[in-house]
Amino acid sequence: MIDQRLVRDNPEVIAQQLKRRGKSIDLTGLQLIARQQRGLEEERSTLQADGNRVGKEVGLKIKGGADPNGEEVAALRQQGNAIKQKVAVFEEEEKALSSQLRDQLLSLPNLPSPLCPDGKSEDDNVEVRRWGTPRIEEGLEEHWQIAQRLNLFDTERSVRIAQSRFVTLMGQGARLERALINFMLDLHTSKGYREVMPPVLVNTASLTGSGQLPKFAEESFRCADDDLWLTPTAEVPVTSLHRDEIIPADQLPLRYSAYSPCFRREAGSYGRDTRGLIRLHQFNKVELYWFVHPDQSEEAHQQITADAEAVLQALDLPYRVLDLCTGDLGFSAQRTYDLEVWLPGAGAFREISSCSVCGDFQARRSAIRTKDGKQTKLVHTLNGSGLAVGRTMAALLETGQQPDGSILLPKPLVPYVGFERLQPE
């Protein structure tokens, strides 16, 4: 959430930065609410000080021998009660304005970093680097074709069980998925991440704190009878691990690695990636998440991206890194690096991880602070996929194709999965 002080005192700065995102927003009304709320807060504070002064005066009068039931003390008490009533009215008005202000602030996206390249769409993203040599051959199968041939997952029965855009992993496919999850978690924990396995049902406050609500309500699955939602990413519950907390500065950075199933309605994606593992309502992902001191966030962004890249490098999967332009940034992000893995069968790079620095945007929504000496300030948060498991499997299937139809797996994965190749069962 954007700092309301910036809305009150420098709305033109917000307007300029949102314009970089391609959004023209008139903040005049929001600034007026912020100033009214601040004015009420100051008036209430003044009244409370007057009330405290009157209360002390009553005590001094009685201590000095005045009759507690006399007219002089009664007049002071009457004055104090009148002040209390005014304070209560101001508190209600201030509460209403604060709620109105927060609701509007929650709908505004994060302000892009000065380092973020300007642009309107994904066409303006900047390629930063590449790793590995993409395999380019004629006649290679796409991952869903390989999966059908090797009976790695079943989509038709999944429609019967649920609906379209679900898969049931079978046999070697299920085993490979489990192996990838364990491989990723082991790799990250070996680098100092603390593994967590959070709830996959989260409340509205958690989704709001991480930035999914109110904007992405239509993208999410919600329980009918409870204030619970199926989490779209482990970023949501991990953000709320420290909601409403003050983290001692000497404990930062906190680095978590979390596996979870993820659930997304994928509204607006009708007709896209209808076959295979690329775009599903339910998928597995290993998430990386950092809580850092504000001075460390840029360095941390480079490191969390490198940690996601390490998975692709360990599996020998060629990829490229894109610095997303302002017009393609996610709602909560200040700056984002996308990792796109090469899919030889499809002949294209596809996103497999987004690594974002969010500044204090999520921390302000979730009231996550740190204390360094006497000073309390908001932490900065970062998140990244490390990695999306289904898309990693898709890349492995297409990259490991052999002339005999088998799929050769990377050597580091063999101890986890128990075999070197995927073959017809």
From Swiss-Prot:
Subcellular location: Cytoplasm
GO cellular component entries: cytoplasm
UniProt GO MF annotations: ATP binding; serine-tRNA ligase activity
Reactions catalysed: tRNA(Ser) + L-serine + ATP = L-seryl-tRNA(Ser) + AMP + diphosphate + H(+); tRNA(Sec) + L-serine + ATP = L-seryl-tRNA(Sec) + AMP + diphosphate + H(+)
InterPro entries attached to this UniProt entry: aa-tRNA-synt_IIb (IPR002314), aa-tRNA-synth_II (IPR006195), aa-tRNA-synth_II/BPL/LPL (IPR045864), Ser-tRNA-ligase_type_1 (IPR002317), Ser-tRNA-synth_1_N (IPR015866), SerRS_1_N_sf (IPR042103), SerRS_core (IPR033729), tRNA-bd_arm (IPR010978)
Keywords, comma-separated and alphabetical: Aminoacyl-tRNA synthetase, ATP-binding, Cytoplasm, Ligase, Nucleotide-binding, Protein biosynthesis
EC number per UniProt: 6.1.1.11
Binding sites annotated in the UniProt record for L-serine: 233-235, 287, 385
Gene Ontology terms: biological process: selenocysteine biosynthetic process; seryl-tRNA aminoacylation
Name listed for the protein in its UniProt record: Serine--tRNA ligase
Biological source species: Synechococcus sp. (strain CC9902)
GN (gene name): serS
